[in-house]
């Protein structure tokens, strides 16, 4: 199952919780990167894309509710 389909099955509350956790992780990754402690720099990109995917799924649900 893809990440997008898994997120589409999650509730909005669960998506919000996951997004908050990802924002915190992104902050920590940026801090580690700035202090040259980050080994896996590609994780920054992965986290950014997961946040974007969550925002997209939430937007799809809001658009669907308005119709």
UniProtKB/Swiss-Prot annotation:
The keyword Transferase does not apply. GO terms for biological process: translation. Keywords: Ribonucleoprotein, Ribosomal protein. Pfam families: Ribosomal_L29. The keyword Translocase does not apply. GO terms for molecular function: structural constituent of ribosome. It comes from the Bacteria. InterPro entries: Ribosomal_protein_uL29, Ribosomal_uL29, Ribosomal_uL29_sf. GO terms for cellular component: cytosolic large ribosomal subunit. Belongs to the universal ribosomal protein uL29 family. This is Large ribosomal subunit protein uL29. It comes from Magnetococcus marinus (strain ATCC BAA-1437 / JCM 17883 / MC-1). The gene is rpmC.
């Amino acid at each position: 199952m893809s990440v997008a389909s898994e997120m589409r099955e999650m509730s909005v509350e669960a998506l919000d919780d996951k997004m908050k956790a990802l924002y915190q992780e992104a902050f920590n990754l940026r801090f580690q990167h700035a202090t040259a402690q980050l080994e896996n720099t590609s994780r920054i990109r992965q986290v950014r894309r997961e946040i974007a995917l969550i925002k997209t799924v939430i937007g799809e649900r809001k658009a669907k509710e308005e119709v």
